[in-house]
Curated annotation (Swiss-Prot):
There is a cross-link at K164 (Glycyl lysine isopeptide (Lys-Gly) (interchain with G-Cter in ubiquitin)). Its main location: nucleus. Disulfide bonds join C135-C162. GO terms for biological process: base-excision repair, gap-filling; cellular response to UV; cellular response to xenobiotic stimulus; epithelial cell differentiation; leading strand elongation; mismatch repair; mitotic telomere maintenance via semi-conservative replication; negative regulation of transcription by RNA polymerase II. The modification Phosphotyrosine is found at Y211. It comes from the Eukaryota. This is Proliferating cell nuclear antigen. The lineage of its organism: Eukaryota, Metazoa, Chordata, Craniata, Vertebrata. One of its GO terms (molecular function) is identical protein binding. Auxiliary protein of DNA polymerase delta and epsilon, is involved in the control of eukaryotic DNA replication by increasing the polymerase's processibility during elongation of the leading strand. Induces a robust stimulatory effect on the 3'-5' exonuclease and 3'-phosphodiesterase, but not apurinic-apyrimidinic (AP) endonuclease, APEX2 activities. Has to be loaded onto DNA in order to be able to stimulate APEX2. The keyword Nuclease does not apply. The gene is PCNA.
Length: 261
């Protein structure tokens, strides 16, 4: 059987909020090393990859590997019934067609027990090649979310230009254009407020803001976000989940001749 207990249950609630608007259903791969999810979004434009390591859970047991087909909207609805302070336990028998979710209030006086039907999903795993990136920008996640939101009022796409001294986000549309430049910060007291850039060569790429705004729903998971870019390969937007793993989004750049469309 599979059983995982998470004292900080709010992490799971935040993960589902970050996934459910982009993906309708996905296969949760459960193994002794942890929980993994990989899925294209419903329009096959972006890819999501989630890792929650077993040691990040307070207790974790997995007797044999499971592939659980989950409707993320349904799971999100059930998790909304959990309080932010609740301890969440996930439980499934080896060949079960349901996943049990148990929410315990911290004072132990209230226990909620839900059972969610699982789905049969035929999922192909895509190999994501490890690679070096020309530009890696680490910045406050709230700042990235604000930039994507602000520029989506101007246009549908953002041009991200990365140089040694800073990173620039630009958008243009019928009402005009907007540019936001963040300089690399050298002496910030708090690491999560810093803008750090590792650059091998300058990069300028265009991305659909609609998808970036979906990705920024993961902002509550991490105070920082990392953007990894190289010419002609998908952008990686990574949110670290403290002591547990990460949530990565992949988005291919828009090709030059598409930009007018």
């Amino acid at each position: 059987m599979f059983e995982a207990r998470l004292v900080q249950g709010s992490i799971l609630k935040k993960v589902l909020e970050a996934l459910k608007d982009l993906i309708n259903e996905a296969c949760w791969d459960i193994s002794s090393s942890g929980v993994n999810l990989q899925s294209m979004d419903s329009s096959h434009v972006s890819l999501v990859q989630l890792t929650l390591r077993s040691e990040g859970f307070d207790t974790y047991r997995c007797d044999r590997n499971l592939a659980m087909g989950v409707n993320l909207t349904s799971m999100s609805k059930i998790l909304k019934c959990a309080g932010n302070e609740d301890i969440i336990t996930l439980r499934a028998e080896d060949n079960a067609d349901t996943l049990a979710l148990v929410f315990e209030a911290p004072n132990q006086e209230k226990v909620s027990d839900y059972e969610m039907k699982l789905m049969d999903l035929d999922v192909e795993q895509l190999g994501i090649p490890e690679q070096e990136y020309s530009c890696v920008v680490k910045m406050p996640s709230g700042e990235f979310a604000r930039i994507c939101r602000d520029l989506s009022h101007i246009g549908d796409a953002v041009v991200i230009s990365c140089a040694k001294d800073g990173v620039k986000f630009s958008a243009s549309g019928e009402l005009g254009n907007g540019n936001i430049k963040l300089s690399q910060t050298s002496n910030v007291d708090k690491e999560e407020e810093a803008v750090a850039i590792e650059m091998n060569e300058p990069v300028q790429l265009t991305f659909a803001l609609r998808y970036l705004n979906f990705f920024t729903k993961a902002t509550p998971l991490s105070p920082t976000v990392t953007l990894s870019m190289s010419a002609d390969v998908p952008l990686v937007v990574e949110y670290k989940i403290a002591d547990m793993g990460h949530l990565k989004y992949y988005l291919a750049p828009k090709i030059e001749d598409e930009e007018g469309s």
